[in-house]
């Protein structure tokens, strides 16, 4: 899919940016720090036009996992050592695939709440657009969970960092108006008052429950939002 990219205007810069995105550069600032800011906007726009990368807020992600894997293993290795032989390339690629598979298996063996905690622990001041809202994901010092009073209520999450407190309700069961109301009550017990209240569910929310959450100024993260974040932070 990258064939001919380097021959286009700003294509060389675009290819450099793409390689660094594949190797963990998530934000425009981070990409610029690695390759310089000259003609960076045009290079990144070319990646969007060629459907090689997508932008969300200040973050960039290669949505095709095969392309991302190829760039970070085969392509990067060939560029650093043009004389490397095919068996070595194949071995490195296979080891990378096995490592990704192991990571995926370990992640899916964890509870949904633990996966969300791991996600929060990776935030580092990136700006993203989720649920028709743009917001910054602070770097948190601590992320802890708390069990609600009822067994069916999922898990509450409290994240602290940069003088901010975020609270989230992490749900695997269907969310209704009462679930939102109990979470709002929990948030009112927090000191300092949470600067963000988030409803996180691995199933689509009922429209009425979503309206109630938005009326309480809560950020709603549904499955598509979580998939985007997991991809952005290399968990899918």
Language model region names:
Residues 1-37, 84-85:
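Winged-helix-like regulatory helical subdomains adjacent to P-loop NTPase cores
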Residues 16-19, 69-76, 118:
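Short, hydrophobic/amphipathic alpha-helical patches that form generic packing surfaces
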Residues 33-50:
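Short amphipathic alpha-helical interaction segments
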Residues 49-85:
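Short capping/hinge segments at domain boundaries that bridge a core fold to an adjacent linker or tail
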Residues 63, 76-236:
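Mixed-charge (Asp/Glu-Lys/Arg
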């Amino acid at each position: 899919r990258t064939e001919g990219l380097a021959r286009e205007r700003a294509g060389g810069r675009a290819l450099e940016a793409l390689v660094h995105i594949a190797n963990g550069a998530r934000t425009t600032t981070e990409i610029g720090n690695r390759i310089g800011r000259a003609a960076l906007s045009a290079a990144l726009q070319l990646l969007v036009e060629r459907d090689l990368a997508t932008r969300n807020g200040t973050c960039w992600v290669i949505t095709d996992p095969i392309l991302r894997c190829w760039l970070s293993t085969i392509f990067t290795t060939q560029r650093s050592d043009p004389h490397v032989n095919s068996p070595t390339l194949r071995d490195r690629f296979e080891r990378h695939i096995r490592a990704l598979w192991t990571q995926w298996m370990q992640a899916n063996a964890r509870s949904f709440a633990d996966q969300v905690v791991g996600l929060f622990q990776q935030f580092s001041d990136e700006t993203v657009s989720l649920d028709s809202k743009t917001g910054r994901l602070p770097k948190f010092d601590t992320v802890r969970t708390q069990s609600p009073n009822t067994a069916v209520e999922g898990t509450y999450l409290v994240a602290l960092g940069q003088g901010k407190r975020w609270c989230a309700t992490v749900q695997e069961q269907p969310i209704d108006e009462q679930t939102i109301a109990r979470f709002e009550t929990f948030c009112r017990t927090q000191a300092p008052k949470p600067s963000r209240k988030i409803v996180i569910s691995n199933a689509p929310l009922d429209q009425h429950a979503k309206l109630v959450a938005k009326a309480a100024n809560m950020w709603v993260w549904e499955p598509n939002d979580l998939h985007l974040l997991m991809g952005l932070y290399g968990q899918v």
